[in-house]
Structure formats: structure tokens, C-alpha cells
Amino acid sequence: MAMLNEASLSPADAHAHANATTPTHSKAAAMASATTMLTTKTPFSIEHILFQNLNSASNNNNSSDTNGIAANTNNYAPKSSRNAVKSARSAFAHDNNPHKHPSQHSHPPQSHPPASASASATATARSNQAASGYAGEDYGKSMHSTPRSNHHSRHGTSHYNGDQISQQLGSGAAQHPPVPTTQPQPPPPPPLNGGSGASNGVLYPNAPYTDHGFLQMTLGYLSPSSGTYKSVDPYFLSQASLFGGAPFFGAPGCVPELALGLGMGVNALRHCRRRKARTVFSDPQLSGLEKRFEGQRYLSTPERVELATALGLSETQVKTWFQNRRMKHKKQLRRRDNANEPVDFSRSEPGKQPGEATSSSGDSKHGKLNPGSVGGTPTQPTSEQQLQMCLMQQGYSTDDYSDLEADSGDEDNSSDVDIVGDAKLYQLT
């Protein structure tokens, strides 16, 4: 008992130790002597309280037989809990001054039955051990299961852990107030390498309609080797303006990727790139070009430059217009030969009557302009006709003109260049 007094045990623990068997008494005495060496002189320190709880837990484990019989008696359970509170308060009052009352530690008062006191102390110790044991075990499980279930939130894990602990503590929590256990939260789950599912929910969140791969994948008609047109769904043709922003066929803003995607082939792609804006001539420019063409079918380079400067056009525009006009003249001659009808090659003007037009002969080098007649009545030649007759009488030669060879294949390629300003039709008589 002297060693128990030095270890400052509670009265309930001392009484339980006195009722234990001889081997239990010897083991408890050895442990008490070992813990007495570690206690400090201050009875109110934290080490004093911790060693007191360890001694009571060891004594309760050694007297398991007596505690088991007392725990099975359900009739004394409420009384033992109330007596445990009273004994704890009395033990704290006696432990406050152990040096002033040494006799009280050696002879504690018997205020409750020994079986009930030991049962209450055992139940309290078991609840503390169970709470700490289950908390540690559950924390270990949560640490092991964290890498496997990263998609669960920490809030759900902590809620599940709290429910599991409350279910496992069972009857101990019903008889005694729950012991607040502060378990550390598991570490936050590492971020996924592949990114969250919300950000990857859409395949192409920002894919523009002008992307090459998007057009080829959507349309599915890619055939760059074919030179012919392919049958395409009309829906894609109607929606083609969404991609290029302009009508598709023959448009200046044609998209080459869309042309390939629709299966139009390399020829259509070349035509799409080659197509340019058509030149619009004004009425004075067209009048000057027509007058010069009626008097001269071919122009040399100096003459072409002079005419372009006088009309405010470029040399290329004048050359192209003359090429197209010659092709039109050939078509008119061919139509006249087939229908055996005279053709008026002059451009009809508001101040001119149709009968005043002249017709040219088949000889383009030395042919002379003869004034036409309507109904057999001759008409007086105008100043323009006189100028044309003077030009033709000079006998201009077309052997040294630079655009003579360029006119050889114009009949097949004449549809590439058009004249928008020449909207007036040539009359056929």
C-alpha cells in the first residue's frame, strides 16, 4: 500500500488493487515501483495525471475476471456510473493534498460497493481504449484507401468515419458521454494527371470551323486525285457559306480546304485560286475600245500603251479586252455563215440608226468599210465612218503585232475572262 500511495492512486483503484490476487498484486507492485521513479515532485503536473491513468488501466486489465462479472450485471449499471463520477470527484479532492493527509490515502473511505466501483472504472477505461483504438484503426484504413478512391471527397470520408466509429462504440457510448477524439484529416488527394472530367466533357470546346482537320472529318469527301466533281449532299452545299462567308461556286472568297473537303478535286481548287475580280468598264471606255476595234483588230505594244493611257486603263486590260472582242467577232462570223444572214459587227449606239452600221468583209487585212443601206437607199457616211475608212486605207499590217500568237487558243479559253461593262447586246440583222 505504501507504493500505491507514492504513486498517488485513486481510492477506487487502490480498493480494486487490494481485492486482486497475489500474483496480480506482485505485478502491479512492480509496475507501480517502475512508474514511481518517473513521476515528478509536482502532483498537479501533466505527467502525474498521465501516469495515474496508465496505472489504473494496467490494474483494470489484470483484474479482468472480477470486472467481467460486475459488467454483466445490468441492474447496477446506472448506479455504477453515478458512483464512478462521485469516486472520481472524491479522488481528485484527495489527490489535491497528498502530503497533508497521508492516512486518507492508506485508508480510503468506503462510499460505494467495491464491485460497482471497479466495474465503473473498467467501463470508463474500456471506452477510452476502444475510442482511441477504433480511431487509430479507422485512420489507418482511411490512409490506405485514399490512393484507391481519389474521386471521393474528404467530407464524405470524414462523415463515413464518424458514422463507423459511432456504430462500433455501441453500448459504451450509450452509458458514458462520448470522449472527444481529435483525429487528423487525411491528406488531400493528388490532382489527376488527365485533368478533371468537367474540363474534358466536350471534345472540341474551341474548335473553329476553319480547321483543316475539322473540315475533312466532317465532310468526309476528300479526294485530291480526282479531277471530276463528286456528288455531295445538298445540305453541305447549303451550309458552305458558314465556312467561307461567301457563296461557294465561283466566289472570290472560295476556301481551298472546303473545296477539297467537298471532293471538287484539284481542277476546282486551281479554278478557285485563279478566279479574280472582273473588270468593270465605264461607258466612255467601252465606246473608245469599240471604236478602235472597228478600225483595227490587232494592236501593237506602243498602240496598246497609248490607248490604255488615253482611256485610263492598264495595258493588260486593253489586251484582254481585245482578245475577248476578237473571239466574239469570230463567233458572230461563224453564226452568219451557218445561218446565211448578215451580221452587224458594230456596237449599236443611241445616236445611231441600225441602218448606218457597216459590215466587214472576210479579208481582215485589206477590207474596206462600205456604208450599208437599208431598203437600197444609200446614206451619207458620218465622221466616225470616215475616220475608219482612212485607217483602213492606210493598209496597216498585222504581221508585227505582239498579241497575234496569243489569239491562237482564245477560242477554247475565252470563258475565263468576261467583260461586265459590255452589257449591251449586239444586234443580228
UniProtKB/Swiss-Prot annotation:
SUPFAM superfamilies: Homeodomain-like (SSF46689). GO terms for biological process: brain development; cell differentiation; neuron fate commitment; regulation of DNA-templated transcription; regulation of transcription by RNA polymerase II. CDD domains: homeodomain (cd00086). Residues 274-333 bind DNA. GO terms for molecular function: DNA-binding transcription factor activity; DNA-binding transcription factor activity, RNA polymerase II-specific; RNA polymerase II cis-regulatory region sequence-specific DNA binding. Transmembrane segments: none annotated. Residues 17-27, 105-132 have a biased composition (Low complexity). DNA binding protein that function as transcriptional activator. May play a role in the determination and function of cell types in the brain. This is Brain-specific homeobox protein. It comes from Drosophila melanogaster (Fruit fly). The gene is bsh.
